C-alpha cells in the first residue's frame, strides 16, 4: 500500500469526519443552529474533500505502483467505483455552501448527483469488485462463463448510474 501509515491515518480521519458531515444536507432547515451550519455543514464538509482526496490519491498511487496491471473484472469495477465517488464527493461539497444549499435543498440535486451516484455507482461497484474477487474463492474456482455479460453489467451499471445522477441533478437545478 502506497504511504501505508498516511493511508491508515487518512482512513481514521475520514471515519471521524464522516460522523459529522451529515448536516450539509440540512443547511436550509431552520431547526439547525447557525453554529452547527457553519462548523459541521460547511467547514467539516469542506475538510471532507481533503480526506476523500487523500484516500483517492493513495488508492490510485497503490494501483500505479502495482503496474503492469491486468484489467481484470474486479479492477474494472473498482475503478468504476472510484469514478462514482470522484463524481459524488464534489456534489456533496457544493451542498456545503449555505447560499447554494438554499436553492438546491429539497430538490432532485441532493438525491441525484450526490447520494445516488455515491451509493449506486461508488459503493455498489466497489462491492461488485469484491464479489468478482470472492466468487471464485467461495465456489472452489468456478469461472465466469461470459466475459461479454460481465462487460454489459459493468457498462450498463456505470453509464446508467452516472446518467441517472446527471439527469436528476439537471432536474434539481431546474427546481424539481
Mark where each language-model region is.
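Catalytic-face loop-and-helix region of soluble metabolic enzyme cores
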Residues: 142
